[in-house]
């Protein structure tokens, strides 16, 4: 799958789940489950409830995503 196939959306962290998973509410109101990308995990980026994040979704499964950026 090419990198350009991903859909990027803004969202807010609603809840922290086990195994670095998060429940994220997107701007359009949908709620998805997202995990942290490898570079964020490697650099110990902390994500807390209420943080604004950028989530990448694949066209194949719009209920799961990957957190790629945390806004300050």
Swiss-Prot record:
Its main location: cytoplasm. The lineage of its organism: Bacteria, Pseudomonadati, Pseudomonadota, Gammaproteobacteria, Alteromonadales. PROSITE patterns: S1_IF1_TYPE. It is found in: Cytoplasm. One of its GO terms (cellular component) is cytosol. InterPro entries: NA-bd_OB-fold, RNA-binding_domain_S1_IF1, S1_domain, TIF_IF1. One of its GO terms (molecular function) is translation initiation factor activity. Component of the 30S ribosomal translation pre-initiation complex which assembles on the 30S ribosome in the order IF-2 and IF-3, IF-1 and N-formylmethionyl-tRNA(fMet); mRNA recruitment can occur at any time during PIC assembly. Residues 1-72 form the S1-like domain. One of the essential components for the initiation of protein synthesis. Stabilizes the binding of IF-2 and IF-3 on the 30S subunit to which N-formylmethionyl-tRNA(fMet) subsequently binds. Helps modulate mRNA selection, yielding the 30S pre-initiation complex (PIC). Upon addition of the 50S ribosomal subunit IF-1, IF-2 and IF-3 are released leaving the mature 70S translation initiation complex. Keywords: Cytoplasm, Initiation factor, Protein biosynthesis, RNA-binding, rRNA-binding. Belongs to the IF-1 family. NCBIfam families: infA. It comes from Shewanella frigidimarina (strain NCIMB 400). This is Translation initiation factor IF-1. The gene is infA. The keyword Signal does not apply.
């Amino acid at each position: 799958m090419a990198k350009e196939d991903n859909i990027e959306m803004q969202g807010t962290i609603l809840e922290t789940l086990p195994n670095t998973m998060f429940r994220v509410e997107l701007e359009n109101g949908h709620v998805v489950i997202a995990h942290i990308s490898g570079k964020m995990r490697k650099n110990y980026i902390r994500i807390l409830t209420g943080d604004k994040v950028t989530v990448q979704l694949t066209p194949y499964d719009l209920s799961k995503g990957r957190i790629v950026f945390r806004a300050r």
